[in-house]
Amino acid sequence: GVTCSDLAAEASKKALAAAGVDASEVDLIIVGTVTPDMMLPATACLVQDKIGAKNAWGFDLSIACSGFLYAMQVGVQFVATGAHKNVLAIGMDVMSSIIDYSDRQTCIIFGDGGGAALIQPSASKEDGYFIDFLHEVDGSGGDYLCMPGGGSQFPASAQTVADKMHF
């Protein structure tokens, strides 16, 4: 099937083409996802290879719905400090790979998709700029929407699969 890195690579190619930037000019790739292709390596590393961004390094952020916004904020910080000039911020999820379709309360609200944006320094405010970011989190509801299987609390096993802990 189609993987997270497949979709992320396609979105990245489109973002680079729209900006007129070659993949070899990308410095950093940040992927916000909770559905990586695998635990290791990072999806950003797989995207780096798939698009030919041989000079880029990258990492993933595991932040679910707001992953793209967090990837953008982190990318903006790398550009604002002058550390990098071309940062790909990607938000991508293949939720169909982890949805329990027998649970009608949740399966109808999730889907596959995402996008990519190239973040670069701006010569002037007329070119566009980020004003600010405001993020909040409330971890108190973590038990209501979670996938407990596969982490350090409940390592992947035949039992966690049988108990549907990976959905």
Give the ranges of each region predicted by the language model.
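Conserved catalytic cysteine-centered active-site region
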Residues: V2-D6, T33-V87
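Hydrophobic pocket-lining "lid/loop/helix" segments that shape and contact the acyl-thioester
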Residues: D6-L16, C107-I108, D112-F167
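Phosphate/pyrophosphate-binding loops at sites that engage ATP/ADP/AMP, CoA/4′-phosphopantetheine
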Residues: A11-D27
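Short beta-strand segments
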Residues: G32, S62, V87-D93, G111, ...
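Short, well-ordered, mixed-charge alpha-helical segments that flank or form enzyme active sites
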Residues: D37-L40, L69-Y70, M95-I99, G139-G142
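Flexible, glycine-rich active-site loops centered on histidine and acidic residues
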Residues: F78-G114
